[in-house]
Amino acid sequence: MNPVLSVRQLEKRFGAVVAADALTLDIPAGQKISLIGANGAGKTTFVNMVTGYLKPDSGTILLDGIDIGKRSPRSAARLGISRSFQIPQLFVELTAAENLAVAISGIGTRMSLRAPAEAQGRRDKAVELLERFGLADLADRPISELAGGVRKLIDIAMALVRRPKLLLLDEPTSGVSAEEKFTTMDRVIHSVAPDAATIVFVEHDMEIVSRYADRVVAFYQGRILADGVPAEVLNNQEVRRYVTGGVR
């Protein structure tokens, strides 16, 4: 089976800083893959290049065999790539349902937010997505009144609007309390399941990584330090030294 995502010799520099150093990686359909590494290791740079927010200096990014390395985020989304952000990208003055309705309408500016949010069909779809995450009772609450963990889930719900084949999540449990992190991740996995999307998630919490990832890719100074099943990677001596500090 061909990989849903294939990256070859991907390079990205910011001045003297090497953010991606000959990255080569295949991601099969249906896997849950966690990207780990210290701050600045290259994880978010990788996600930004795959989703079109950053152009690589060289190398190729193939989605189902289509070169997407120079496409815009909107174009990448049309082909089946979607993402959430470490800091949720929401309109705080709108309700949860209105934010999702804006995403459903494809309008990304503030100039005409209310009209699409009032369309019944879009609202029904918005509430359906919120129900997946157990958040339907918050549909009419303004984002400004919602806790950080709930905002994360709504941001991820927005990423599911297009039913992507590849979903990239940037630290889905950051800012979520220790008591809520497993519940949050359970909701994410459950909610993505109907679309059968491949999930790539950046994560610093090794408990989350070991519980939810089928495969772990460890980054260090723009390179892939280790790649394999969680137990193998998290016990790798170089990973323990440079990434986890011995923490599992």
Regions found by a protein language model. Give the residues of each.
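Glycine-rich phosphate-binding loops of nucleotide-dependent enzymes
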Residues: 2-248
